[in-house]
Amino acid sequence: MYQSIYETEFAARPSYDALPESRNVDVAIIGGGLTGISAALTLAEAGFTTVVLEAGQIGAGGSGRNGGHVCQGWPNDFFHISRQLSPEDADIAWDAGMAAVDLMTTRIETHKIDCEPHFGYLHAALHKRHMAELDAMQAEWEARSYAHFTRLKGQSDLDAHIGSTAYVGGLYDTGCGHIQPLKYLHGLAGAAMRAGAQIYENSPVSRIERGAPKQLHVAGGHTIKARIVMLCGNAYLADVGLPQMTHRLAEVVSSVLATKPLSENLARQILPTGAAVADCNTALNYYRIDGSRRMIFGGRSSYSKINFTNVTPNMRRRMAAVFPLLEDVEIEQVWSGKIGITVNRIPHFGRTVDDIYFVQGFSGHGVALSGQAGRMLADAVIGDATQFDVMRKLNHQIFPGGPLRTPALALGMAWYKLRDYLRL
């Protein structure tokens, strides 16, 4: 259930040893996803001795099994950020979000990472309210000099990019796109290792002993002593997450489907320009055609702790509703796993007085943004905390409900799904 198509096709992916011995470092990073590996690369390039401790395998979490969508900016409307900040700080926050895709593309080129990058993204509107939301987004972004949007007014415009009649219009965005995320992550890890970072798999941290230095107790009886610690595990930090983190993050189970490779003709009928697509619903569908011409379709999330073991029928129905031509296509793989969300869907940045840094809650928007967040954490340690300090000014609410917060979240999302269905 947890193995993605990326793992299946990337059989020769690198592996890393478990931590073999105790050692002293400048920075210890818990979590070998895009955030942690990005931070490690930036720190190693600046000359910091850095170790990454991954409890399982690199890419076993959301960084290695997501839908592969590369998106600009922050997950929610920028208004939710700018209203809490001065105009000067809002500009810094905007620039930080917009740096994410540029950072990714620069690293792909610099380190020659083979991860199937493709640019072109369709924000698809299911009804008039969605088009109004996209029009507002276009106006806001273009007021800040974003120049990658083309408004699609109806079916004739849509036909150039998508073979579906499910939508009334959309925004085509040449500044976003898609990649094979596991290949990108391992390419980034290789670059971090070459820069001098140490990466260890199967090295879970059971406890952080505060002090100077901090001591991380790792499986196998080893200890890492570090001046600075970064918590980059997002939804996978149950044993070592800080109280100010855990109450501001909710775990959501997200699912993705991969079809068998489509014929060249069928793939071209469905997505003629190869763009990635996401609709504007709260419980959205998102999809793309990968480098092997598989349809990679996401759109089934669980906001409760009920364990659903077979999401394939639901995922197939959702895909066929958009593309009737795929109703009978053979499914190769379906997988699920946890992601972390915040109340406002904006990532939560923080730092303790004794230099434990963290970021969490990319809310399904982390393929590019998590790498940028990792660089922001690293930059703060290196000496430029400008972007990091602005983002940690944002207020992040505690999820309501206390011990009942999971059913409360599920109930709230049921309302949003009904709202999507009724097109309210």
Describe these PLM feature segments.
Residues R65-D95:
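Glycine-rich active-site loop/strand segments that organize a redox cofactor
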Residues V25-V52:
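N-terminal Rossmann-like FAD-binding beta1-loop-alpha1 element of flavoenzymes
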Residues D102, T110-H118, V205-R207, P213, ...:
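Active-site substrate-recognition segment that forms the wall
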Residues E140, A166-R227:
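Helical element adjacent to the flavin cofactor pocket in flavoenzyme catalytic cores
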Residues M1-V27:
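Extreme N-terminal leader/targeting segments of oxidoreductases
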Residues M1-E9, N76-S82, T106-G120, A124-G187:
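Flavin (FAD/FMN) cofactor-binding and adjacent substrate-gating region
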Residues F297, S301, K305-N307, T312-Y421:
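C-terminal catalytic lobe of FAD-dependent flavoproteins
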Residues E45-R65:
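Glycine-rich FAD pyrophosphate-binding loop
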